[in-house]
Amino acid sequence: MKVAVLPGDGIGPEVTEAALKVLRALDEAEGLGLAYEVFPFGGAAIDAFGEPFPEPTRKGVEEAEAVLLGSVGGPKWDGLPRKIRPETGLLSLRKSQDLFANLRPAKVFPGLERLSPLKEEIARGVDVLIVRELTGGIYFGEPRGMSEAEAWNTERYSKPEVERVARVAFEAARKRRKHVVSVDKANVLEVGEFWRKTVEEVGRGYPDVALEHQYVDAMAMHLVRSPARFDVVVTGNIFGDILSDLASVLPGSLGLLPSASLGRGTPVFEPVHGSAPDIAGKGIANPTAAILSAAMMLEHAFGLVELARKVEDAVAKALLETPPPDLGGSAGTEAFTATVLRHLA
């Protein structure tokens, strides 16, 4: 099991190292046979190679079975031309591997309901996974353009595009609570009708998973009023962009949010948070999202579902016992990671 490690910039190297400590502990205990190779990416790669996604890193990604990414960017590189900024490396990475499904879990951990902007009784038990189609829809549809008098974009999906992201959602639901909500706007958009029909066809191949449909406007309301009732949510690119950001505020801190991007090539696992250059090197970064991204890697890249859940349980206990500064505690990166490791033992 070969992993390409891309620590990136800012707090990226610190939180990635925390995740690697957890993976090494599991490897030692379970004999997983994990192998790691570290490559420069983002701003660090610009400094070394003049571009954010250089050829050695590209080759390393191609040869790996999974990518564990830290974070990219920072004020040091903000003045560069857009095509060579660190963030452009992320787009190039995703495109090079044809990563068409973005998975964004949002979980309110037991005992941390107070962090959520919602009332505690509403936030309690929230554990939702947003599966967003990543490479199609209105962001990429043609024709598109703008004149002095008007502007236009095209919302377009093919059947294979919808089918493949729907399968990702149903497969994920099988490992969770076996319930999928498909989100569209089928009452006014032909693309929505097509999306709904195609997801229903895919769903027939998963008789053990319940399927429900919601219009996107109603879904936004439900995610605020009763988020705990949802398991897996699958939707198109633009709706997924909006709903995943809405869901991301439910736990109360970006430091708790991992993500995965899956597709035809090497899958990428990374925290949702940015590089936080203001706290880089201070040893106070919350590594939870990076550790949970590693757990997602175990599950989605290597099929080690039970070990992934074991990591999640250890993190949940550590958050209560030694919370990091962004959650109102005082545990630095190393101290928090040590608590996670203790609960894994």
Curated annotation (Swiss-Prot):
It is an enzyme of class 1 (oxidoreductase). InterPro entries: IsoCit/isopropylmalate_DH_CS, IsoPropMal-DH-like_dom, Isopropylmalate_DH. The gene is leuB. NCBIfam families: leuB (TIGR00169). The lineage of its organism: Bacteria, Thermotogati, Deinococcota, Deinococci, Thermales. GO terms for cellular component: cytosol. Belongs to the isocitrate and isopropylmalate dehydrogenases family. LeuB type 1 subfamily. HAMAP family: LeuB_type1. Catalyzes the oxidation of 3-carboxy-2-hydroxy-4-methylpentanoate (3-isopropylmalate) to 3-carboxy-4-methyl-2-oxopentanoate. The product decarboxylates to 4-methyl-2 oxopentanoate. Mg(2+) binds at D217, D241, D245. This is 3-isopropylmalate dehydrogenase.
